[in-house]
């Protein structure tokens, strides 16, 4: 996270524009039993994004953090979620193109209305 963001920022600061989007998970804002390593890494990434947003915003670089609290429709999900078909029928699995549309929206935001953090989850997800 940090190294990728730093390298992207080096190129963007020369151009005085750009967008860096970090992807997190529910663990970015809430720890859970058995998830200490994952949660600490995701919370750390969120802190990196916050710091970079404050540092790079004045240089016209939009830094955002996206929390994905969902199963995204991939082959791995299809193979490993026994209730995949049922969840898919009721919009309980996120479609990758819908996820991508949210990233494009972040990218296209005008500077006077930048979003720092976006939570994406299906309607049925418990939070």
Segments (PLM) and residue ranges:
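Short beta-loop-alpha junction of Rossmann-like oxidoreductase domains
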Residues: 34, 61, 65-80
């Amino acid at each position: 996270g940090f190294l990728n963001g730093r390298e992207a920022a080096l190129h963007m600061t020369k151009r005085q524009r750009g967008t860096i989007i970090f992807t997190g998970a529910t663990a970015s804002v809430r720890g859970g039993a058995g998830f200490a390593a994952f949660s600490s890494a995701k919370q750390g990434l969120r802190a990196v994004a916050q710091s970079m947003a404050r540092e790079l915003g004045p240089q016209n670089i939009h830094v955002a953090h996206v929390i994905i609290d969902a199963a995204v429709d991939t082959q791995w999900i299809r193979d490993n979620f026994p209730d995949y078909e049922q969840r898919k029928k009721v919009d309980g699995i996120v479609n990758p193109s819908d996820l991508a549309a949210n990233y494009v929206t972040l990218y296209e935001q005008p500077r006077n209305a930048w979003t720092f953090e976006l939570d994406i989850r299906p309607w049925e997800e418990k939070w």
